[in-house]
């Protein structure tokens, strides 16, 4: 089911800048028992992204209500919200563009997540590296060609997810998830000021770890440094947290961090 600017429809104007330039942002939320998990965080993410992309929006109360309505109809599943700058403007220029377009859709919850949660995730190093751009770093914008290529290469392997470096070789994230690793009592996660997506569940885990006995450090780390970990986990708003059992030839057997985070992230407030 799709809602475009509050109307049930599945067609979008070809002049919309989402199709012309990927000019917009999106978020993907989990629906549990008819409610959007971490609803306020998802709306805040969209607001922050629109501000950084200089997209003017005045429909936030309507959007929140539409998200709640679709979630109630789906009960359990996935809610995706896309915001584009709308139509207009000549070429790349944003002058005379808008109003912004909002697109909501609901789909079923990924059936394979339960199996992966039980068996653990295997990671493969991606040959595709992320470009560094502080103007876009952290935003879940509509330009996802890097992730499309990462996924295409991943599907030629037997791994479940990809470990992705940036163009300078620093560990950044996975194809569709953020990454944490633990060495002793210290938990590390990559800095995302140059590349990567600052995920909703990553933010939630950081808040949890700040209140825990673990020491959290946001780092610029090499692949070799990250693979010296005692344990790895990945997370996104849908998973929400999964243990990594192997990355390439390196195996992980500890699940201490996962066992701490998993129950707290399953139904986050």
UniProtKB/Swiss-Prot annotation:
<dbReference type="InterPro" id="IPR001544">
    <property type="entry name" value="Aminotrans_IV"/>
</dbReference>
<comment type="similarity">
    <text>Belongs to the class-IV pyridoxal-phosphate-dependent aminotransferase family.</text>
</comment>
<dbReference type="Pfam" id="PF01063">
    <property type="entry name" value="Aminotran_4"/>
</dbReference>
<dbReference type="GO" id="GO:0005829">
    <property type="term" value="C:cytosol"/>
</dbReference>
<feature type="modified residue" description="N6-(pyridoxal phosphate)lysine">
    <location>
        <position position="140"/>
    </location>
</feature>
<dbReference type="InterPro" id="IPR017824">
    <property type="entry name" value="Aminodeoxychorismate_lyase_IV"/>
</dbReference>
<dbReference type="GO" id="GO:0046656">
    <property type="term" value="P:folic acid biosynthetic process"/>
</dbReference>
<dbReference type="GO" id="GO:0008696">
    <property type="term" value="F:4-amino-4-deoxychorismate lyase activity"/>
</dbReference>
<dbReference type="InterPro" id="IPR036038">
    <property type="entry name" value="Aminotransferase-like"/>
</dbReference>
<protein>
    <recommendedName>
        <fullName>Aminodeoxychorismate lyase</fullName>
        <ecNumber>4.1.3.38</ecNumber>
    </recommendedName>
</protein>
<dbReference type="GO" id="GO:0008153">
    <property type="term" value="P:4-aminobenzoate biosynthetic process"/>
</dbReference>
<comment type="subunit">
    <text>Homodimer.</text>
</comment>
<keyword id="KW-0289">Folate biosynthesis</keyword>
<dbReference type="GO" id="GO:0030170">
    <property type="term" value="F:pyridoxal phosphate binding"/>
</dbReference>
<comment type="function">
    <text>Involved in the biosynthesis of p-aminobenzoate (PABA), a precursor of tetrahydrofolate. Converts 4-amino-4-deoxychorismate into 4-aminobenzoate (PABA) and pyruvate.</text>
</comment>
<dbReference type="InterPro" id="IPR050571">
    <property type="entry name" value="Class-IV_PLP-Dep_Aminotrnsfr"/>
</dbReference>
<dbReference type="InterPro" id="IPR043131">
    <property type="entry name" value="BCAT-like_N"/>
</dbReference>
<keyword id="KW-0456">Lyase</keyword>
<comment type="pathway">
    <text>Cofactor biosynthesis; tetrahydrofolate biosynthesis; 4-aminobenzoate from chorismate: step 2/2.</text>
</comment>
<dbReference type="GO" id="GO:0046654">
    <property type="term" value="P:tetrahydrofolate biosynthetic process"/>
</dbReference>
<dbReference type="InterPro" id="IPR043132">
    <property type="entry name" value="BCAT-like_C"/>
</dbReference>
<dbReference type="InterPro" id="IPR018300">
    <property type="entry name" value="Aminotrans_IV_CS"/>
</dbReference>
<keyword id="KW-0663">Pyridoxal phosphate</keyword>
